């Protein structure tokens, strides 16, 4: 759908790139039994380096779709906005019905039950989007078409 090849980079890629010991012992990232996510010492430094790397990729001329979860709401967006400096960004908020989110979560073996419900309450707090898209009943393709049409009017 995109006119050139783009990269998809997201929070799950960052987590996979982190040292196992910081994930296993919870010192970098801890996911509670109810799905609450807490970050430990060192997370922000690694996150900042990741963001700077993504910004460098975009600065080199490669398009990137960033799949991020703003666990800190507005503060999380500000960290990413700062790293991206003057780069052109289309901020897209992705939402879905809580029942749909629970069903999708159940299909993912890497998710703790309740994680989606916990996160939906915090990830959009104070975040400013150029557009939002509800994926509850829309296909990924139709969502992509909607986003692409917005990209063509803003770039």
Region locations from a protein language model:
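Conserved substrate/cofactor phosphate-moiety recognition/catalytic segment
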Residues: 1-49, 55
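Conserved phosphate-donor/acceptor-positioning beta-strand/loop module used by diverse small-molecule
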Residues: 84-106, 133
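Glycine-rich phosphate-binding loop used to anchor ATP phosphates in small-molecule kinases
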Residues: 37-87
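Small-molecule kinase domains that catalyze NTP-dependent phosphoryl transfer to phosphate-bearing small molecules
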Residues: 103-149, 153-155
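Short, hinge-like loop/turn segments at secondary-structure boundaries
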Residues: 24-28, 83-85, 108-112
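Hydrophobic residues in well-ordered beta-strands that form the structural core
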Residues: 10, 65-66, 93
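Conserved nucleotide-binding/hydrolysis micro-motifs of P-loop NTPases
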Residues: 13-15, 72, 95-101, 138-139
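Hydrophobic "anchor" residues on beta-strands that sit immediately upstream
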Residues: 8, 63-64, 130
């Amino acid at each position: 759908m995109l006119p050139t090849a783009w990269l998809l980079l997201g929070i799950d890629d960052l987590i996979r790139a982190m040292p196992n010991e910081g994930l296993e012992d919870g010192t970098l990232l801890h996911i509670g039994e109810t799905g609450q996510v807490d970050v430990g010492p060192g997370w922000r430094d690694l996150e900042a380096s990741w963001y700077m790397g993504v910004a460098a990729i975009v600065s080199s001329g490669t398009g990137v779709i960033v799949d991020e979860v703003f666990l800190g709401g507005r503060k999380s967006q500000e960290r990413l906005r700062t790293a991206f400096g003057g780069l052109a960004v289309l901020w897209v908020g992705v939402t879905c019905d809580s029942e749909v989110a629970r069903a999708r979560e159940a299909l993912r073996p890497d998710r703790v039950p309740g994680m989606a419900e916990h996160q939906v309450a915090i990830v959009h707090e104070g975040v400013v989007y150029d557009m939002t898209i509800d994926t509850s009943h829309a296909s990924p393709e139709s969502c992509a078409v909607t986003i692409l049409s917005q990209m063509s009017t803003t770039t």
